[in-house]
């Protein structure tokens, strides 16, 4: 058996946390041969801490062979101590009458604190995934607040958009999700994201050619993927928690264990690829190997795609401007 690794999860007693923790503890994220120690963070509020205790009791009651230990805390420095992986799930949701700029600032405070704590106590190789929205900008803030950790260690979750897009394309083309390769999502995890199947194939056949419906792409596909979260809230009365947790598992598993040359989508700090300014936390097609991701290079960006990429980039630049005074 391998040595246990430490996995920190924030917002651990929330909806997504509840869908996530049991899957991490069962080995779905890091493999069936990798023991884990869960380090669980919740806000310093009695109700949340009580709920966290209940979740930990349930984790105990599963008797997972791979769960080598567990702590629950309200202190980020305890939760992130020596963490090898950190899933930052907890964030402040938008309340009634709250402007987006207010939301950015409120979450900015949270992610500055968490970035600083990671900087101070986490493993120097910690892999950080920000799930809490606005995920790209929260990840950017955490990254900027952790100057002693490599910027590449910080990522934002676009895998939910990616997975949503996969299923829509599979259903339209009449192919199996598992057979689709080379689909990607560019930009921000928001309705402005650009899901792109121009390069995608199923069993070697071009999906763009198979679908061959530009009107569907623009008027049905992109709005459906972009507004899927809102559609789920409307239908279920609650936000998409299980599918978000599933996407977080996918993102971390692929980052840790590799994609064998397959493309996946990750929000990563730009290296200037495709004209995206350096440092912007942006969804790109990537491949991963040995715990490192690489942005897929050399893809042609046509006029429609450039327009959509600029649109989502502009939103990210506006978000960055809104919190510019908070991060150096």
Curated annotation (Swiss-Prot):
It catalyses: (S)-malate + NAD(+) = oxaloacetate + NADH + H(+). Substrate binds at residues 94, 100, 133, 164. The keyword NAD applies. GO terms for biological process: malate metabolic process; tricarboxylic acid cycle. Pfam families: Ldh_1_C, Ldh_1_N. The active site is at residue 189. Its EC number is 1.1.1.37. Signal peptide: none annotated. Keywords: NAD, Oxidoreductase, Tricarboxylic acid cycle. It is an enzyme of class 1 (oxidoreductase). NAD(+) binds at residues 11-17, 107, 114, 131-133. GO terms for molecular function: L-malate dehydrogenase (NAD+) activity. Catalyzes the reversible oxidation of malate to oxaloacetate. Belongs to the LDH/MDH superfamily. MDH type 2 family. HAMAP family: Malate_dehydrog_2 (MF_01517). This is Malate dehydrogenase. It comes from Acinetobacter baumannii (strain ATCC 17978 / DSM 105126 / CIP 53.77 / LMG 1025 / NCDC KC755 / 5377). The gene is mdh.
């Amino acid at each position: 058996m391998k040595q246990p690794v430490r996995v920190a999860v924030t917002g651990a007693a929330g909806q997504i946390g509840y869908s996530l923790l049991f899957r991490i503890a069962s080995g779905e994220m890091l493999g069936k041969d990798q023991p884990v120690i869960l380090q669980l963070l919740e806000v310093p509020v009695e109700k949340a801490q009580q709920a966290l205790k209940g979740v930990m009791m349930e984790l105990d009651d599963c008797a997972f062979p791979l769960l080598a230990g567990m702590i629950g805390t309200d202190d980020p420095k305890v939760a992130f101590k020596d963490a090898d992986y950190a899933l930052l799930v907890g964030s402040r949701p938008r309340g009634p009458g709250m402007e987006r700029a207010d939301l950015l600032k409120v979450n900015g405070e949270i992610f500055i604190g968490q970035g600083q704590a990671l900087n101070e106590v986490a493993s120097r190789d910690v892999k950080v995934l920000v799930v809490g929205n606005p995920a790209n900008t929260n990840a950017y803030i955490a990254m900027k607040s952790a100057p002693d950790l490599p910027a590449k260690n910080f990522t934002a979750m676009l895998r939910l958009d990616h997975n949503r897009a996969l299923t829509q394309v599979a259903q339209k083309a009449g192919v199996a999700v598992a057979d689709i390769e080379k689909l990607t999502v560019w930009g921000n995890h928001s309705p402005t994201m650009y899901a792109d199947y121009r390069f995608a194939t199923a069993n070697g056949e071009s999906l763009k050619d198979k679908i061959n419906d530009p009107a569907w792409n623009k008027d049905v596909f992109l709005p459906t993927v972009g507004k899927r979260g809102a559609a789920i809230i409307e239908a279920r009365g609650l936000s998409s928690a299980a599918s978000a947790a599933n996407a977080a598992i996918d993102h971390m598993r692929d980052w840790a264990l590799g994609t064998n040359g397959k493309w996946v989508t990750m929000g990563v700090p730009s290296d200037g690829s495709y004209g995206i300014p350096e440092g912007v936390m942006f969804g790109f097609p990537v491949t991963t190997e040995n715990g490192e991701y690489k942005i897929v290079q050399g893809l042609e960006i046509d006029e429609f795609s450039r327009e959509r990429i600029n649109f989502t980039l502009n939103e990210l630049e506006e978000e960055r401007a809104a919190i510019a005074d908070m991060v150096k």
